[in-house]
């Protein structure tokens, strides 16, 4: 993943392009930039409210295509080129089930460009103010997209508005998804975590090349939502990420979120499923890997529907131990961080996919059945959850709202707050937020009870109201929402510049210290203190202690929840 990739035969061509670029100046409709692999030609775009255009470079390779023998392998250095490379077309999507990408497009009221799909997908896009050039040394913000590690793309996000309004470079990256990104034989033949290795390769490319686009390689902030935020939280815990980034923003996702780890039994079962398809002995990893590398992309996609337990693993390299253990041992990269959640993470997008029936309303019996099924809390102990969450709740809508809040607490809010405490106690400055605004564009398309749902903050961070290109992120934004978007872009960019989101003309954002103050992001921004403190205590203290005292047999999934959330209590008691 390292080394000098310059080819001597390129020298004369580069001299010509350098001379041409000097004559042409930094502001041009066809910006040219040097990289260690060869020259690239981008294009320019504009955003609403700004005269200055933004330079856009699409589809720059940061690794060799992971095809053939490189499938289920660590990413290799990209292949250099001799001629000027056009970087004006969107790269292919990484292989994924397109059905949900299209469904999300409708549910989120966004529009994406037409994109191809291929395993040859390890590319990144760059958005830079047109004045940015070698020596500008602007802050760099690298977006790692989400999508449950199953869907997503660099090209469904447009960094133009954030770049030109805040004078930063925005880079959006791609990484392998699903079985392509996480298949493992649980040994040295295919240790797994390919998606995380892809992210490391992209960050290495940024470190070695971003200065030629006007970015500062010593001021790189990684930010992302959902699976992207989980990736960032994971990169913070990996020893391999040293010097690749300097600040981190985690939007609705951290590495200790329950359900990220599959049980050993599930992995063994799915390996056997794969072996049966390949007509191989499951113990013959080399033969199994050879068979899988000969399968078509579509065959692997079909196989992934039968074998869904391939997720992140402790491989002894990217992860030396489980994320919770690394956090508790303070084995993490100490960087300034922003961690945040939305005030109804499981309000609509997530349940409409997995449990749409509860959106119409629920009774207590149905709610408890879902809790038992999804969280594996023993039936005899569901009364504890009933007392905490459903006391005094009788109407179907009240029970539904409470149930959705419970799932949001378990999967996003409590893990986020627990992670923030670990980061704080490890010595890194932490800022926490709760996004609370329901976007106006959903006025007629979402149920009225839905507040700020999962991913709703993204359109504000990217300046969605000001975009006018192929990616439409926020039509029908109100004037108040445009102002909120400006403020959020400013907070995020200030943090990318200095590690502190505060700045002139912005409501103060307190650091997340022992007082646990946080920012409430809405059209009227305010601060709060000890977000959902009672719920955090319930999931990290009350319920685990009762279950432990009763010696209840816990499922692997729920054991992970309890371990993830109880450890801060146990550690503080031991200290």
Swiss-Prot record:
Active site (record annotation): 226 (acyl-ester intermediate), 345 (charge relay system), 454 (charge relay system)
Catalytic activity: a carboxylic ester + H2O = an alcohol + a carboxylate + H(+)
Signal peptide: 1-28
UniProt-listed Enzyme Commission number(s): 3.1.1.1
Keywords: Disulfide bond, Glycoprotein, Hydrolase, Secreted, Serine esterase, Signal
Cysteines engaged in disulfide bonds, as pairs: 94-121, 280-291
Pfam families assigned: COesterase
An annotated GO cellular component: extracellular region
Domain of life (superkingdom): Eukaryota
CDD domains xref list: Esterase_lipase
Uppermost EC category: hydrolase
Post-translational modification: N-glycosylated.
Location(s), subcellular: Secreted
Family to which the UniProt record says this protein belongs: Belongs to the type-B carboxylesterase/lipase family.
Protein name, entry field: Carboxylesterase 5A
Species this chain originates from: Mus musculus (Mouse)
């Amino acid at each position: 993943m390292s080394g000098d990739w310059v080819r001597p035969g390129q020298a004369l061509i580069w001299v010509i392009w350098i001379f041409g670029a000097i004559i042409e100046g930094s502001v041009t409709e066809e910006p040219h930039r040097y990289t260690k692999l060869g020259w690239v030609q981008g294009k320019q775009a504009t955003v609403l409210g700004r005269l200055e255009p933004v330079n856009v470079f699409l589809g720059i390779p940061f690794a060799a295509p992971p095809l053939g023998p490189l499938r289920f392998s660590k990413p290799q250095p990209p292949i250099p080129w001799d001629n000027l490379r056009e970087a004006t077309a969107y790269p292919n999507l990484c292989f994924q089930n397109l059905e949900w990408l299209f469904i999300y497009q409708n549910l989120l009221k966004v529009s994406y460009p037409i994109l191809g799909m291929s395993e040859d997908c390890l590319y990144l896009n760059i958005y830079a103010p047109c004045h940015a050039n070698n020596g500008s040394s602007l802050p760099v913000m690298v977006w790692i997209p989400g999508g449950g590690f199953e869907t997503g793309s660099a090209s469904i996000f447009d960094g133009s508005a954030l770049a030109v309004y805040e004078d930063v470079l925005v880079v959006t990256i791609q990484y392998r998804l699903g079985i392509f990104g996480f298949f493992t034989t649980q040994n040295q033949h295919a240790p797994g975590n390919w998606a995380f290795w892809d992210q490391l390769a992209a960050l290495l490319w940024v470190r070695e090349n971003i200065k030629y686009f006007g970015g500062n390689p010593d001021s790189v902030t990684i930010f992302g939502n959902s699976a992207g935020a989980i990736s960032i939280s994971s990169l913070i815990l990996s020893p391999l990420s040293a010097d690749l980034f300097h600040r981190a923003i985690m939007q609705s996702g951290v590495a200790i979120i329950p359900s990220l780890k599959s049980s050993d039994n599930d992995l063994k079962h799915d390996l056997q499923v794969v072996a049966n398809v390949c007509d191989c002995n499951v113990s013959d990893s080399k033969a199994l890997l050879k068979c899988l590398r000969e399968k078509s992309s579509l065959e692997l996609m079909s196989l992934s529907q039968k074998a869904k337990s391939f997720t992140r693993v402790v491989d002894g390299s990217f992860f030396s131990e489980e994320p919770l253990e690394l956090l508790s041992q303070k084995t993490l990269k100490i960087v300034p961080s922003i961690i945040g959640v939305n005030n109804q993470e499981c309000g609509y997008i997530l349940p409409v996919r997995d449990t749409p029936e509860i959106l119409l309303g629920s009774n207590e019996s149905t709610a408890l059945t879902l809790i038992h099924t999804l969280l594996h809390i023993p039936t005899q102990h569901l009364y504890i959850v009933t007392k905490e969450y459903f006391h005094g709740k009788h109407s179907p809508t009240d029970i539904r709202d409470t149930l959705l809040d419970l799932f949001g607490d378990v999967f996003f809010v409590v893990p986020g707050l627990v992670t923030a405490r670990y980061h704080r106690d490890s010595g890194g400055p932490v800022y926490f937020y709760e996004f609370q605004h329901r976007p106006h564009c959903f006025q007629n398309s979402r149920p009225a009870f839905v507040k700020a749902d999962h991913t709703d903050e993204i359109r504000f961070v990217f300046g969605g109201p000001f975009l006018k290109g192929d990616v439409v992120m926020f039509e029908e934004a109100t004037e108040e929402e445009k102002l909120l978007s400006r403020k959020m872009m400013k907070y995020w960019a200030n943090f990318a510049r200095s590690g502190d989101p505060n700045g002139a003309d912005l409501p103060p954002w307190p650091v997340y210290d022992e007082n646990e103050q946080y920012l409430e992001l809405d059209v009227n921004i305010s601060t709060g203190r000890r977000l959902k403190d009672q719920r955090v205590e319930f999931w990290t203290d009350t319920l685990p202690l009762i279950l432990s005292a009763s010696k209840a047999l816990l499922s692997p999934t729920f054991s992970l929840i309890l371990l993830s959330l109880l450890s801060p209590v146990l550690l503080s008691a031991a200290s």
